[in-house]
Amino acid sequence: MAAAYLDPNLNHTPNSSTKTHLGTGMERSPGAMERVLKVFHYFESNSEPTTWASIIRHGDATDVRGIIQKIVDSHKVKHVACYGFRLSHLRSEEVHWLHVDMGVSSVREKYELAHPPEEWKYELRIRYLPKGFLNQFTEDKPTLNFFYQQVKSDYMLEIADQVDQEIALKLGCLEIRRSYWEMRGNALEKKSNYEVLEKDVGLKRFFPKSLLDSVKAKTLRKLIQQTFRQFANLNREESILKFFEILSPVYRFDKECFKCALGSSWIISVELAIGPEEGISYLTDKGCNPTHLADFTQVQTIQYSNSEDKDRKGMLQLKIAGAPEPLTVTAPSLTIAENMADLIDGYCRLVNGTSQSFIIRPQKEGERALPSIPKLANSEKQGMRTHAVSVSETDDYAEIIDEEDTYTMPSTRDYEIQRERIELGRCIGEGQFGDVHQGIYMSPENPALAVAIKTCKNCTSDSVREKFLQEALTMRQFDHPHIVKLIGVITENPVWIIMELCTLGELRSFLQVRKYSLDLASLILYAYQLSTALAYLESKRFVHRDIAARNVLVSSNDCVKLGDFGLSRYMEDSTYYKASKGKLPIKWMAPESINFRRFTSASDVWMFGVCMWEILMHGVKPFQGVKNNDVIGRIENGERLPMPPNCPPTLYSLMTKCWAYDPSRRPRFTELKAQLSTILEEEKAQQEERMRMESRRQATVSWDSGGSDEAPPKPSRPGYPSPRSSEGFYPSPQHMVQTNHYQVSGYPGSHGITAMAGSIYPGQASLLDQTDSWNHRPQEIAMWQPNVEDSTVLDLRGIGQVLPTHLMEERLIRQQQEMEEDQRWLEKEERFLKPDVRLSRGSIDREDGSLQGPIGNQHIYQPVGKPDPAAPPKKPPRPGAPGHLGSLASLSSPADSYNEGVKLQPQEISPPPTANLDRSNDKVYENVTGLVKAVIEMSSKIQPAPPEEYVPMVKEVGLALRTLLATVDETIPLLPASTHREIEMAQKLLNSDLGELINKMKLAQQYVMTSLQQEYKKQMLTAAHALAVDAKNLLDVIDQARLKMLGQTRPH
């Protein structure tokens, strides 16, 4: 089955639906054939039923099975084998049922020659029904609803105007009951409800035109009300089953009938009936009982062709088990014979539980038959490669495997070696089928050659042994400096594969251990070397299928080699695929590989892009924290891995090209090799330039120091960048928040302040963590190196005599921290001397929903009373010193659960103290407290809650707010008139806050299962906390009004 792609950006919507029946087939632009297919189906959506469709992108090798699979997968259908694909001509009654093995491109070429593409309509339909299909479909709700919509549509189009009035009324009322199942049984008794159904929805959606035209409006209304009451207690599923029960006597939707003739020479005109209950039967007269011909389990082969007479009728031949001669059916045309053959073949596949077709197609003139596959002895299998290909291989890998000379054999020498020449050493790794050991091979050329030895755990059976040796059979094809070389095999039990030893182990572990010592040029070098190996494989027309850092071995510090060629053979075994689903590298695989098990050179390009990302991330695995089942959803929603720190924009742009959803838009390995070579040369040139600048600075420092023992000056203030470039690039939190990873234009400059802030302040590091879905720890960020300004003289010699270099750096960092804290203290002093210290709305502006002060991400709001002008606030304590950090008990931010790694603990936040009033019977105070509690409860539950639970939680907050506002309305008349305006403004602000919370909730539901879901959850928390804070402000306003009223009533 070839790959097809459901394009989320092209989904059909009501606004873009066609007004006529034209434009429903293949779309194409002038001069080029667009690989886009519009497929109509009966999966319900919010639009009109006539516009239910999916837009599918497909490749040249896509077959009909791939199109069907893609659509039904998105609806979680169980009975996939029941679905068929129909092509209809809109200007005639021409209908073609497309077999699942037909290629979509060949279908277009064939039928668009006869009619323009806009005159064709592609439909997904349920055609093949199992016995007792309704009972089976009740366990598969998407299929049951699909079949109901299909049958209802056929009924309305074909026979609705001919059925009895009572049946039409019942069927129409059952559809009303199903559509509005929450509606009470007597709801249509009310005139307003009936008018909504009649005018807004339209009765023609439920009843045939003949009934609406023949019955007066008042009479029809009474008939509908009476009939609807009969089904008042049915739920949706019961309404569907009742619909089928009433319709089946007048319309046999469970079988298809064809007017044809039995025999070829002496023929009998009959009506052939094909269905799950009858099997293959025929009727000679309408009133007679059907005569059974055969069951689907008896059909062995199906053939069809044109008859040899002048009428060119279609001939269908069925080879039936136990019958002396084939059953011959003469159809009016070859098209009808093809449609009958597809129907019988679909039923045969369904009842036999196989995807193998029973149709034998005649060999066309000019086609050559495939050669027979020779059966080789074991000794022959060891010495040579056979081109025997299983059926599953030809289906999945038609673009890769060829009957011609696919591989160039490097040599014909025998790879079998003697076991006594191998000295088995310690185990250095564990594989899927066995362990890997270090060893010594005593060859004639080298008596002590270090080798790696793969052993097989369970190689007693021939099948396991052959699968294990397949990797050796594959590796012997290649001779490349960056591909692990095969040295030999031992085919006798226990089976061993001997390969060259890469002493530094697998690349992923190597990157993790050496991440602080490897520079960017080395990382790009590894990617480039892998691209040369994969370009070599591409030239050999070979697909690796498991490109990942764990399968790359490090031969030396400047040489890596691609290994592990075993998965390609194992993936071809469908039984192994199903049994070992968890072992598939889902997070590295291309979307067409995940969906259809289709592996091509383009899917290798995708995996290589992920492998490059791993290298740049120093061995971090992709999509950490994401379930395998959720990966394909994120990819199809446009999400890609983020740009790694220190990654050049040109390299990340190249990665994103590797991750194009359409395989045809991905670059080839030859292009990747050339572009990586260019990027590597650029990085080497930049590295040399940095080294020259560094050496000049060192010389300047040594020349200018003059033996001074003065302590080094403090680094420059934040916001005044140093001329010196940082050693690497580390994005700021603002850049890390970007969810569109294709945007590389936000690549910041090379000033050292960004890297410095990321390492000095743990709070900043946590901000990086919380926006990164893959939980990179702040320890991965390199330590800040002190900036040395050109105008500053730093005596390294004098310092070195007193302090070691690392202590000197710690002193510089401590001075930088003190300078930052001094700056914050001055800002706070200036702010606190202002007359209005009321809590600012800026305290809820943080993205993670936690409360903070109005100054910025690092400045937490400090509540104080009126400061004494003679005594400014105390200077804040040094980091690590005991302070009065706390959290607001009533408004603690649960959004911290989004943050992974180091948590940024908010300091205590409290508005100006509440007035000292008697609260014993204060309804406003009680309701404000109730609202705050509702916000806290919602905040504690929102993180793990599914989207359908958002509405009840927000509803509780809304009810608490409504109660509060009603209480305030009762209190306002008792307060001075001069305060009413301020109270009303505070009430409006609360209503606005609730509206904002509802909007954020809708966005969080809309973008569920995407990279934006967490972002909108955070915004929900932010809106909820704003609501709670403004409720407290409303209480303060009312308290001030009460105090004012008390002041006016006091005697003077």
UniProtKB/Swiss-Prot annotation:
Name of protein: Focal adhesion kinase 1
Subunit structure: Interacts (via first Pro-rich region) with CAS family members (via SH3 domain), including BCAR1, BCAR3, and CASS4. Interacts with NEDD9 (via SH3 domain). Interacts with GIT1. Interacts with SORBS1. Interacts with ARHGEF28. Interacts with SHB. Part of a complex composed of THSD1, PTK2/FAK1, TLN1 and VCL. Interacts with PXN and TLN1. Interacts with STAT1. Interacts with DCC. Interacts with WASL. Interacts with ARHGEF7. Interacts with GRB2 and GRB7. Component of a complex that contains at least FER, CTTN and PTK2/FAK1. Interacts with BMX. Interacts with TGFB1I1. Interacts with STEAP4.
Reported tissue expression: Detected in B and T-lymphocytes. Isoform 1 and isoform 6 are detected in lung fibroblasts (at protein level). Ubiquitous. Expressed in epithelial cells (at protein level).
Gene: PTK2
CDD domains xrefs: FERM_B-lobe, FERM_C_FAK1, PTKc_FAK
Annotated crosslink Glycyl lysine isopeptide (Lys-Gly) (interchain with G-Cter in SUMO) location: K152
Bias (Polar residues) ranges: 10-21
Membrane topology summary: Peripheral membrane protein
Entry keyword Cytoplasm: yes
Residues bearing PTM Phosphotyrosine: Y5, Y397, Y407, Y570, Y576, Y577, Y861, Y925
Residues with PTM N-acetylalanine: A2
UniProt-annotated location(s): Cell junction, Focal adhesion; Cell membrane; Cytoplasm, Perinuclear region; Cytoplasm, Cell cortex
